Amino acid sequence: MAPSHVDKVNTRTWSASIVFMVLTFVNVSVHLVLSNFPHLGYPCVYYHVVDFERLNMSAYNVMHLHTPMLFLDSVQLVCYAVFMQLVFLAVTIYYLVCWIKISMRKDKGMSLNQSTRDISYMGDSLTAFLFILSMDTFQLFTLTMSFRLPSMIAFMAAVHFFCLTIFNVSMVTQYRSYKRSLFFFSRLHPKLKGTVQFRTLIVNLVEVALGFNTTVVAMALCYGFGNNFFVRTGHMVLAVFVVYAIISIIYFLLIEAVFFQYVKVQFGYHLGAFFGLCGLIYPIVQYDTFLSNEYRTGISWSFGMLFFIWAMFTTCRAVRYFRGRGSGSVKYQALATASGEEVAALSHHDSLESRRLREEEDDDDEDFEDA
């Protein structure tokens, strides 16, 4: 079937979105490379935000001065930036693969607006725009770190986390209910069936980034709050654990209540949350200023509670996943054939209909003989 006018318009719009996506990825990559050289317009390197040697857990914030708070150190920030670039690269490659398979195929399909359906399921123009926003906000986040502006660092970390969250939700749900998403999957072009597995990998990879960004946004919010209000540094360190726990629990519950219906294999956020916990441990273990004071007990208990929450939700996800795989074949077998009661009811209805037709034929014969 020839592509319709709607297919042509949507394909062109989607293609333009992918072109802008590639340009944005190149822009962010160049920015990250150049930001390692302070003399090229950046006041400082982005990965050196806090001097942990000057951190004092018992001190209060001094207005108009930079107060060191709990944040990622230089090695962690470089690894974080490199990993985020790899995630952006993987998502960009995914969109390019989908574009090639949808735009360059010779068999356009037998359904009306087939390309529009395929684009809508694999990642439409709005989802591509959300991904562009995620890359742009990440670029602005690293830019604010190079200027060492606590308030802007906290703001851009929250905006980037929000954009990445919306992009992940759109990739998982396609803005539809589960039944409608299943209907669109059944109408997908046969040549895109294998790409769905690639899409599942991308969803989990984005969720890994989202899980680690939970730690980053918790640190950034408390870092900005601690540099703008008269609070003690030790209290802000403990507040990082509270913010992290609240955000991670909300996401764990959303995965178990809603998102698991759309994508069965969802362990990306759990893996990213684990890496985030390790990211919290590293600066605290590395620098003695965190543990050589009265906050040692509170920090230890906070770590224990966070790991317990993570282990509980990860175990729940694993149990539900493997239990769903074990019962999947029974569900499909039940849908394959009709039940015995339905077959018996249909047979009884057919026999009654046949008897009624025979009686009418006999009556007609009798009337004809009388005539």
Swiss-Prot record:
Gene coding for it: gM
Subunit structure: Interacts (via N-terminus) with gN (via N-terminus). The gM-gN heterodimer forms the gCII complex.
Species for this entry: Human cytomegalovirus (strain Merlin)
Cellular component annotations (GO), alphabetically ordered: host cell endosome membrane; host cell Golgi apparatus; host cell nuclear inner membrane; plasma membrane; viral envelope; virion membrane
Lineage, uppermost ranks: Viruses, Duplodnaviria, Heunggongvirae, Peploviricota, Herviviricetes
Function: Envelope glycoprotein important for virion assembly and egress. Plays a role in the correct incorporation of gH-gL into virion membrane. Directs the glycoprotein N (gN) to the host trans-Golgi network.
Name the UniProt record assigns to this protein: Envelope glycoprotein M
Compartment annotation: Virion membrane; Host Golgi apparatus, Host trans-Golgi network; Host endosome membrane; Host nucleus inner membrane
Annotated spans, Disordered: 346-371
Alphabetized Pfam families for the sequence: Herpes_glycop
Compositionally skewed regions (Acidic residues) per UniProt: 360-371
Sequence intervals crossing the membrane: 14-34, 80-100, 127-147, 152-172, 201-221, 240-260, 265-285, 299-319
